[in-house]
Structure formats: structure tokens, C-alpha cells
Amino acid sequence: MSAQEERIPEDDDTTEAPLTMAASVVLTNLPRDASKALETAGSLNVQKITVRLHPIGSAPALTQRVFKLSTNQRFDTIVRFLRKRLGVKEHESVFCYVGSVFAPGLDEGVGGLWSGEELVVGYAMAPAFG
């Protein structure tokens, strides 16, 4: 073996734990904050929200602009619905914006996008905001 090659040391079975099992702390119950967090973990507050679709620029207006959607749905549900209602072809694009501020990802949950009374989604046939 050359001087440049170093060997990786073998595992040493003589390693001692810093504490013995008798000296370690065993929790008999969880702290209050952890217990409360675990009670609500996994249970999503699924409710219906109002979604208002608003055309931007020269985008065609829908006859029905307001509909209800469960908060556990993804944003792509809105985009697919909109594409179907507008009759958009596969090679054409629809650009959607929440509150005329940002374009969420298609996999984003709708429940995290709204606040207040309704979710306002602006849509355009060409990029509307830089």
C-alpha cells in the first residue's frame, strides 16, 4: 500500500455508549404541546371554498365565474376545469394567477392559497405579469 492510500478503519466493536440505558430518560407521557399537535395531526379541515375566475386581458369571460371546490384539491383541478370550459386545445396555454399576484404550482393545494371569503383566480391566454 502506498503512502497516499489510507485505509478506512474497521468498525470497532468496543465503542461504549455515552450513557447506560439505566441512566437515560424514559418519557412516560408527552409534553402538552406535543400531545395537542398529535391530536390534530393527519386530520385536515376539509371544507368547500368559493373560487372566482376572473379573465385578464383578452381572455374570454366564462358564463359561470363562481364555483365551489374542496380545500383538499390541487390547483391543477382549477386549471383543468378552466381549460375545459374555455375549450383550449392541447397545444394552447392558459396562465393562471392567484389574486393577480403569483402563479402557483399545479400540485399546490387549494387550501393553502385562499384567505378571506373566496379564492380569486385570474386567467389569461398569454403571460399577463412579468
Curated annotation (Swiss-Prot):
Keywords: Autophagy, Isopeptide bond, Membrane, Protein transport, Transport, Ubl conjugation pathway
GO terms of biological process kind: autophagosome assembly; autophagosome maturation; autophagy of mitochondrion; glycophagy; piecemeal microautophagy of the nucleus; protein transport
Gene name for this UniProt entry: ATG12
Subcellular location(s) of the protein: Preautophagosomal structure membrane
Main location: membrane
One Pfam family from the record: APG12
Cited CDD domains: Ubl_ATG12
Its job: Ubiquitin-like protein involved in cytoplasm to vacuole transport (Cvt), autophagy vesicles formation, mitophagy, and nucleophagy. Conjugation with ATG5 through a ubiquitin-like conjugating system involving also ATG7 as an E1-like activating enzyme and ATG10 as an E2-like conjugating enzyme, is essential for its function. The ATG12-ATG5 conjugate functions as an E3-like enzyme which is required for lipidation of ATG8 and ATG8 association to the vesicle membranes.
Highest taxon in the source lineage: Eukaryota
Protein's membrane topology: Peripheral membrane protein
Residue intervals passing through the bilayer: none
Record has Membrane as a keyword: yes
InterPro entries per record: Atg12 (IPR007242), Ubiquitin-like_domsf (IPR029071)
Molecular-function GO term, any one: protein tag activity
Protein name as it appears in the record: Ubiquitin-like protein ATG12
Entry similarity comment: Belongs to the ATG12 family.
Origin species: Phaeosphaeria nodorum (strain SN15 / ATCC MYA-4574 / FGSC 10173)
